[in-house]
Curated annotation (Swiss-Prot):
It is found in: Cytoplasm. The keyword Cytoplasm applies. This is Co-chaperonin GroES 5. The lineage of its organism: Bacteria, Pseudomonadati, Pseudomonadota, Alphaproteobacteria, Hyphomicrobiales. Keywords: Chaperone, Cytoplasm, Plasmid. Disulfide bonds: none annotated. It comes from Mesorhizobium japonicum (strain LMG 29417 / CECT 9101 / MAFF 303099) (Mesorhizobium loti (strain MAFF 303099)). InterPro entries: Chaperonin_GroES, Chaperonin_GroES_sf, Chaprnonin_Cpn10_CS, GroES-like_sf.
Length: 98
């Protein structure tokens, strides 16, 4: 992705979905109409973090380049620089892969 001028605020992250396999382990090809949207992605950009009760800035646990798992209905779909991306809160992320 070309460097975007978009920077998420607070505890939000920008995620690019990682495409799922188009073939099963047994070699069956899955048509596009039967595929579900992948729940795995790569973080493209992160916000500066959220503030705790005392007003102290708490940085995010994830960083650009991390591969993550997120919920099926997580985030808001947006199009930036012609690319379909998701913007979600860090709390929508279930975990980091690898």
């Amino acid at each position: 992705m070309a460097k975007s001028k978009f920077r998420p605020l607070h505890d939000r992250v920008v995620v690019r979905r990682v495409e799922s396999e188009s073939k099963t382990a047994g070699g069956i090809i899955i048509p596009d109409t039967a595929k579900e949207k992948p729940q795995e992605g790569e973080i493209i950009a992160v916000g500066s973090g959220a503030r705790d009760e005392a007003g102290k800035l708490v940085p995010l646990d994830v960083k650009a380049g991390d591969r993550i798992l997120f919920g099926k209905w997580s985030g808001t779909e947006v199009k930036l620089n012609g690319e379909d991306l998701l913007i979600m809160k860090e709390s929508d992320i279930m975990g980091i892969i690898g």
